């Protein structure tokens, strides 16, 4: 309920409502703590290049599909990529390798999707550097690591930063909890590229910007991947009851 209300305030209101004005002190505190976290972080550099795919807003924007596509493109060009992720929604925080037969509650649904669709090694862990080190120890052939989410996880050194936005853009442009931003929009000037997932307007920065479009293929059960259903078959049908 609260999440839906905040989404409306962040992305549908052009001006700050009185309720959001009351949250301004929390936004200032969040900004201060975020800056301290970045300043105090001691980045761990892995022995292979690291590409971080993240975003500035809370919630999904298309990071996982882009990570999957990048893994496929790197493989096609002779690289041996591996993927690390936080694994949101899982029961633990430790480093866990993700296999095709892993359970979503153990590794997270998005890392499980990546493991099944990408065909590359995947490892989850709250500490991405530890997850990357474990992945490299188990798969020494890996020569590049993709980090699905983790733009704000400064404990992991990175060589390339890609930021994804969807059609909602940056919302009202304010920091959490007044707006949806984890970091200020000025951060866009320091990343390597901005990827717009059906983004309607561009940001006024010189950072290279590219467009992407997601197209549904088929659905399958996470607990039984053999059961599939094409997206076309579900056209016009209600899915929630």
Which positions does each model-derived feature cover?
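Residues lining hydrophobic/aromatic ligand-binding pockets adjacent to catalytic sites
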Residues: 2-3, 11, 26, 82, ...
């Amino acid at each position: 309920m609260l999440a839906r209300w905040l989404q409306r305030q962040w992305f549908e209101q052009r001006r700050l409502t009185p309720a959001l004005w009351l949250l301004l002190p929390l936004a200032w505190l969040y900004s201060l703590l975020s800056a301290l976290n970045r300043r105090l972080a001691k980045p761990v550099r892995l022995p292979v290049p690291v590409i971080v795919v993240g975003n500035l807003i809370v919630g999904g924007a298309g990071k996982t599909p882009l990570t999957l596509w990048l893994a496929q493109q790197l493989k096609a060009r002779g690289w041996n990529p591996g993927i690390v992720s936080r694994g949101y929604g899982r029961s633990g925080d430790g480093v866990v390798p993700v296999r095709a037969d892993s359970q979503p509650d153990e590794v997270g649904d998005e890392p499980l999707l990546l493991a099944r669709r990408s065909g590359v090694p995947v490892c989850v862990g709250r500490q991405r550097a530890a997850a990357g080190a474990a992945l490299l120890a188990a798969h020494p052939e890996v020569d590049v690591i993709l980090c699905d989410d983790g733009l704000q996880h400064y404990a992991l050194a990175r060589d390339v930063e890609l930021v994804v936005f969807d059609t909602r853009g940056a919302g009202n442009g304010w920091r959490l909890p007044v707006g949806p931003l984890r970091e200020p929009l000025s951060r866009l000037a320091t990343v390597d590229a901005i990827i717009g997932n059906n983004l309607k307007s561009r940001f006024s920065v010189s950072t290279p910007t590219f467009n992407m479009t997601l197209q549904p293929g088929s659905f399958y059960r996470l607990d039984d991947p053999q059961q599939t259903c094409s997206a076309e078959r579900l056209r016009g049908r209600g899915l929630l009851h």
